[in-house]
Amino acid sequence: MSDKQKNVLGEDLEECSNNPLTGWFRDGCCNTDENDHGVHTVCAKVTTEFLEWLKEAGNDLITPHPEFGFPGLKDGDGWCVCAMLYAKAVDADKGCPIFIKRTHANTLKHLPIEKLKKFAIDLS
């Protein structure tokens, strides 16, 4: 039996991004635990519009912070974003594409699978 965390489809969670290195644990995956109060579980392929919306919402992921090893994000980067903020972005028509197979199952506490599938770019 696999000890990997699960995605929203009930399958093993796939890697989101290792360049830039993402995830609550900075392991490249949108893994989570009880200490992840931001619920960094949505594997997004960020867009400029989404990043600008996030910055206006108080979560600046554009500005580099080398002291934390954070390069700043740009259009097309993969990143584990906060499920609650992503839900707000969707409600504001600012949601960006996501990799649903790389999005953690805990995301379903904040967004229904039907909404997530509308933004998924990795479903056949």
Locate predicted features.
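Extended boundary segments
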Residues: 1-49, 113, 120-122
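Glycine- and charge-enriched low-complexity intrinsically disordered segments
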Residues: 104-124
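Short, compositionally biased
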Residues: 86-109
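Short alpha-helix capping/helix-loop boundary micro-motifs
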Residues: 62-69
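Short, basic/aromatic beta-hairpin or loop at an interaction surface
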Residues: 45-60
